[in-house]
Each structure stands twice: as C-alpha cells, then as structure tokens.
Amino acid sequence: REVFPSLNKLTILSDYKKMSQKRLGLVRTKIEQRIDFDPESLLIGKSNKVKKRKLKPKEFQIFINQDLQRIKNIALKKQIVQYILIHELLHIENEDLITLSKNYNRRKKKKIHINNFEEEVFNRFNRLRKLKGIMQIEKREHLDIAIQKILELINWHKK
C-alpha cells in the first residue's frame, strides 16, 4: 500500500491459480456498463443520443501462477510474487483493464507494455525493497535475468 497510495480505497484480493506457463500473473475485474439516455425523447423521436458509460470497478482479483509455489526458498518466492503483484497493481493504477474492454481501434492506440511501464514496475519494486530494508537492484536487466534463472530452477519452460 505504501508503493501504491492511489489504490487504498479499492478492494484487491490475490490468490494462486492454475494457468498456462506463458503467464506469471493476471488481474481480473467486472466492468459495469451503464447506458444513459432519455427514454421519452428516444421513443417520440426527438433525440437519438445514447451514451454508454463504463464505471470504474472497486474490486479487483490478482491471480499468481500456482506453479510458482514450487520455489522452495520462501524469500525468493516472496520477491518474485511481489514483483508480479507490483506489475498487476500498476495495470490497475493505469486503468488498463477499462481500456482493454473498449473496441479494438481504441485499444491498439494505447500500448500497454511500453518501455516506461516496465521501468515503472522496476522502480516501484525497488521502492518496496528500500522500505523493507533490502538492498536495491541497480539495473532492470539484472532483475529480469535473476527471475529467469529462478524460473529455470523449477523447470518453468519444461513442463
């Protein structure tokens, strides 16, 4: 919560879930749509304006791949899960799920995993490590390589 103060009012649940080896985690929510129009003017024929509004959800679910539970070292598992959680929380903060539920023409204009996004995940992860008194990591590439090596230890890509 210290790294994401803007998400304090939201309900965020997390759990392990069986999923494909291609993904480490995912975030899910229900996006409510409201149709806003004046029924009288629509039926009489005076106005034909109908607006669809998407309401920002208040509850989210983050799922972590249950295969990560095979990591024996609890401290390593905790760091990898925290990194994945920060990644998914940043999607929530950027309201990417609301954009993804729009039509494709709007969606393709908003690139989600741009370089700044991954850099922001790395910065937030380092901020969390600093708050917990753990040494910070200098480069994002080092973190990516370390995570890949840990995943190789549990035969991540050889299932």
What are these regions, as identified by a protein language model?
Residues 88:
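Walker B catalytic acidic pair
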Residues 1-83, 92-159:
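Active-site-proximal or metal-binding-adjacent scaffold patches in catalytic folds
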